[in-house]
Amino acid sequence: MSELNYEELGLKVGLEIHQQLNTSHKLFCNCSTNLKEDYKLTLERYLRPALSELGEVDVAALFEWKKGKKYVYRIPITTSCLVEADEEPPHAINEEALKIALAIAIALNSNIVDEIYVMRKIVIDGSNTTGFQRTAIVALGGMLKDEGVTIQTIAVEEDAARKIDERTDQVTYSLDRLGIPLIEISTGPDIRSPEQAERVALKIGQLLRMTGKVKRGIGTIRQDLNISIKGGTKIEIKGVQKLELIPDIVRYEAMRQFNLLKIKEELNKRGVSKNLILSNFVVKDLTELFKNTNSKIIKSGIEKGGLVYGIRAYKLKGILGWELIPKKRRFGTEIADYVRALAELGGLFHSDELPNYGITEEEINKVREALNATTEDGFILIVGERERLDKAVEVIRDRILLAFDGIPKETRGALDDGTTKFLRPQPSSARMYPETDIPPRRIDEKLLEDAKKFVPESPESKMKRYITLGLSEELAKEIIRDPRLDLFEELVNKYSPKVSPVVIASTITNTLKYVKSKGGDISKINEEDIEELIKSVYENKISKDSISEILLEYTTNKNVELKDVIRKYEALPTEELEKIIDDVISSNLDEIRKRKDKAVNLIMSKVMSKVKGRAEGKVILELIKSRLKNVME
């Protein structure tokens, strides 16, 4: 993928970091924040959008309501109560969660509000039994100084219910996660490159982890991105859980938006307008035409009682297949996303990708004839039941018309390859209204003093402290930049001074680089693995010198467990080590007498190759020197 000039493109990126807080209980009740599946009961709900204070309906809420889905909630015994079921009013806001959020606000030099007001944010995708999410702004403003990125808001809010299963007409959730406190940190649209977006997310994540009061693991932190380019509009991208995906998501989204604007230009060049699209919009039932088709998808749809519709796309030849992201997404993919989300239908084909999928040239010509399509026109084929097809036709028409606006306002979901898909329209200002069941909480001096206990240390202070621990300035800088900085702190607190902080820092940084350079798959190494190694050094099970070899063997062999590799490299008993040294010396006596004092390096090299990290180099050297001294006398 060719790199765009992001400055010329006018790229602007803002981040929203959502991190679960590790508090003793949930945000608005006393239930545990641990995830447990000990449910015995379920409840069912249908949710409807409510009017805002101004009598308006949020478009995103309306979109979800139109799906008509039933929501089923599992009720865990130990991690939910009547508050989660929306059968009891919420309790007072969790003070511990407030203190953690205030600590982060202090660290980011934000302006803390005088009073906290809880608001209701309308959400009717079923992830909240109430039909809204409770959220409260704690601070405004602030700055991530070394990146020049402003902080807009810091808020506490309740996490959503955990999705268990989704079908066409029903979604099942567990209430164990609903109500776990989250901190939300929103930056200004000040980020100007994909790489900076990742750095900012990393630094905010590190700041949160350094409080020691956030949860860790998959699903405990989520990044949302707001991305725009010159001439376009802000697009929200939800649910980025992997930090390393952020640069690709920004690159791909910038490219997608750039090409959508190019399509808008091309439509104008062709003299096409919305009115011309509508007046030449032809839809035909082509089921009979495809009754003997070799296309498996169309054939299967017809056999299930479905129909095949053909839609003329006036003067859109080449537009439907226009690559928004090379080899990943075309304009036709965007239309298909809308159809999946709004009409719940797959099985869409367009003329720019045919003949293919078993559809022949002869069938293409018959479709063109039936739709009265010229060589300048494109067409779309879709298969399904009549009711959904009629809805799909409306969706396809509306998405083609949106192409004349360039970039439609959307909320999109992040995918594992760094691309995104359409989820729903963007929510409007009609989404928020005050929570009437919870009184305001004034921020007093005592709350602020308690919060200061959780304020994380500044990078400058860390640098000085790490150097006093024995780290070089270069290693200290490297560990401060590393995503596993909080792991380093944790391991130093647990295992030093017996295990040197230098060894711990080097393992996390330099050793992993070495393993990767030797072909090891370092994605296999998690934080628990690193702690297991450091703990083994602490317990004298292995030598610190064996860490790199253990990790290399572990990451270059698919079917091995770390514990088995550690067992293989367990430290040699002193007697066995002495015997190896004596055997090497006795086998090289002539060379030793010839080299004299320089023989140490020869013997050291031969012993190390036999020991393979199962003993400390320092210990081996001392034993060799004492034995060579006896030989030379």
UniProtKB/Swiss-Prot annotation:
Alphabetized UniProt keyword annotations: ATP-binding, Ligase, Nucleotide-binding, Protein biosynthesis
Catalytic activity: L-glutamyl-tRNA(Gln) + L-glutamine + ATP + H2O = L-glutaminyl-tRNA(Gln) + L-glutamate + ADP + phosphate + H(+)
Coiled-coil positions: none
One GO cellular component term: cytoplasm
InterPro entries noted in UniProt: Asn/Gln-tRNA_amidoTrfase_suB/E, Asn/Gln-tRNA_Trfase_suB/E_cat, Asn/Gln_amidotransferase, Asn/Gln_tRNA_amidoTrase-B-like, GAD-like_sf, GAD_dom, GatB_C_1, GatB_Yqey_C_2
Record-linked PANTHER family: GLUTAMYL-TRNA GLN AMIDOTRANSFERASE SUBUNIT B MITOCHONDRIAL AND PROKARYOTIC PET112-RELATED (PTHR11659), GLUTAMYL-TRNA(GLN) AMIDOTRANSFERASE SUBUNIT E (PTHR11659:SF2)
NCBIfam families tied to this protein: gatE_arch, PRK04028.1
Assembly and binders: Heterodimer of GatD and GatE.
Name this protein carries in UniProt: Glutamyl-tRNA(Gln) amidotransferase subunit E
Organism: Saccharolobus islandicus (strain L.S.2.15 / Lassen #1)
